[in-house]
From Swiss-Prot:
Annotated Pfam families: SMC_ScpB
GO-annotated cellular components: cytoplasm
Protein name as catalogued: Segregation and condensation protein B
Top-rank taxon: Bacteria
Keyword set, alphabetical order: Cell cycle, Cell division, Chromosome partition, Cytoplasm
Annotated source species: Clostridium botulinum (strain Hall / ATCC 3502 / NCTC 13319 / Type A)
Lineage: Bacteria, Bacillati, Bacillota, Clostridia, Eubacteriales
Amino acid sequence: MNKDHEEQLEINEVSQKNKYKSIIESLLFMSGEPINIKDLATILNCKQDKVSSLLNEMNNSYVGKDRGIKILIHNRAVQLVTKPENSIYVEKLLKTNVRQSLSQAALETLSIIAYKQPITRVAIDEIRGVKSDRAIYTLLEKNIIKECGRLDVPGKPILYGTTEEFLKFFGLDSIEAIPNLEDLLKEFSKEEN
């Protein structure tokens, strides 16, 4: 094999590695959630060891640079995360955007959970008159509500309640600081008259 051919193979290998890194970065960015290394290997049609090696190279390229992200690997699952030193800025963004980013259905569902917790999805659906699966999923993803047990009836449905993040987002010291529902209803009925 001549030297030119070896150099061409090396260039092709570097190009292929960079393509894989680009794809991995896109997948991690779009997912927002941890992705198993095995799943990345399947998507890329390569071995898990190669994916692990690429991830280490990628993370090394983020370390020490003025980059705002890094790769977190835990239990063979990978996630693109912000660097801890930027957390105060990320928190500010999340606090200002959480109310704007919740749909009407999510806000209704959150209100029901806040006032009736712990409560099942079926009970929420009955109060709203429509299914609440998507709204509950969104609220769980945003860590505003959590699963807080199971109701002791056949089927053992999940009970939902609010989180510390809920209190932070709405500037409340405790769940007891939520305005009294009856007082709110009286106030709204006065405004309508």
